Amino acid sequence: MRAEIVKDRVLVEKKAINEFYNNGYYGRPKSSGLELTLIEAVYLAFRGKIEVEHEGKVLEFSDLFKEASILQPSFELKYIVYKDLRERGFYVQPGVTDFRVYPRGSHPGKGAAKQFIYVRSERAPMPLRDLLRSLAAAENVRKQMVLAIVDEESDITFYDVKRPRLKGEMKEPLYPDINADATFLEDRVVVWDEEASKTLFENGFYGKPLDSQRLQLSLVESRYLLEKGVLNINNRQDESMDVDAFSKMASEIEPEFNLKSSVYTDLRDKGVVPKTGFKFGSHFRVYSQVESPTKIPHSEYLIHSIPMDHEFTLPVMSRAIRLANSVRKRMLYAILTDDGVDYIDIGRLKM
C-alpha cells in the first residue's frame, strides 16, 4: 500500500483505516485517509505493509529511515523503543511525553492507556526539570510514568518513576528534659553528657557512641538538634553557636551541607530515621522505624539530595539504582524546592 510523507507525517489512502487502524491501532483516521507518525510509518514499512513516497520517489527502507531521522529529533531512539514495545504485544500510540502504552489485553476504544513512556539516550544528560515535567503530565491523567533509556548497543532499560509516600512510625520525642552541651570539633560534634548521649542514641537513633559516656553526631544531626533546642553547641574556642553560625561553618566543611540538612529535617519531620548512606554512595539510608539500636531493622530507602537545576548523568543514575536494588532498597531522590522537599522514586521495571 502506497503512502506519502507530508511535512512530519505520513498519509495513507482511506482503505488503510480498516487494515491498519481498526486492526492494529496505527495512526489517526482523517477525512483524507490515515495519518501516521514517522515512527509508525517506518515500522509498517519494515514489516512490508506500506511503501512510502517522498517528492515523487518511492523510498528504500534505509532512505526512509534516514529521512525520518532528519525530520524528527531522536527518531532512531524512539523507533527502537516503539518497535520493542510493539513486538512485545503492546498497543502503542503517540502521547504527551513520547508514547502512551495500553496494558496487555487492552487497546484504544476498549480501555485507557496505562503508561506514558519517556525516551532518552544513555549519553544525553537528563535535566531534572524535564523529568518532573513528564512525571506531572503522567500524574495529571493518572498514568504510570516509564523512563526508557537506550544504551549504545540499542538495549533498552525501563524505569518506573513515581512519587513515594514517605511516612515513618517514629513518634519523635522532643526531649523536654534535655538541654545538653556539645562541641563542634573539626568535622563533627560531640555530646559530653552521659545521660543525654544515651537518650539521644537509644530513643532517636542519633549519632554513634564515641565511648560509653559520650556521643558523636554528624553535622546534619547536630544542626537539627540545635534547631530543636535539644543541644547547646560551642566551637572549639568555647564560643556559643546559633543555627546560622553553625550552618555557615558546616557549609565550609561540606559544600552540600544546606541541601542535605534541609532533606534531613524533612525526613525526621516525616517520622523516618535517616542515617548516612555513604557506604552505598548516597546521602542517606532511611528506616521507617528503629525501636532500639540493638534491633536495627533493614533500611528501606537510599536517598540522594539534589537541587532543582540538577542534570542526571544516566550511567551514574543507573549504577545507583542497580546498587539500591542489589541491597533490597528503593532509590529515592530528594529535591529541594521553593515549597519544601519533594521526592521521586526511580526503580527498574520489567515491561
Curated annotation (Swiss-Prot):
The active site is at Y287, H298, K329. Keywords: Lyase, tRNA processing. Coiled coil: none annotated. It is an enzyme of class 4 (lyase). One of its GO terms (molecular function) is lyase activity. One of its GO terms (biological process) is tRNA splicing, via endonucleolytic cleavage and ligation. It catalyses: pretRNA = a 3'-half-tRNA molecule with a 5'-OH end + a 5'-half-tRNA molecule with a 2',3'-cyclic phosphate end + an intron with a 2',3'-cyclic phosphate and a 5'-hydroxyl terminus. The keyword Lyase applies. Its EC number is 4.6.1.16. It holds the Pfam family tRNA_int_endo_N. GO terms for cellular component: cytoplasm. Homodimer. Endonuclease that removes tRNA introns. Cleaves pre-tRNA at the 5'- and 3'-splice sites to release the intron. The products are an intron and two tRNA half-molecules bearing 2',3' cyclic phosphate and 5'-OH termini. Recognizes a pseudosymmetric substrate in which 2 bulged loops of 3 bases are separated by a stem of 4 bp. Belongs to the tRNA-intron endonuclease family. Archaeal long subfamily. This is tRNA-splicing endonuclease. It comes from Methanococcoides burtonii (strain DSM 6242 / NBRC 107633 / OCM 468 / ACE-M). The lineage of its organism: Archaea, Methanobacteriati, Methanobacteriota, Stenosarchaea group, Methanomicrobia.
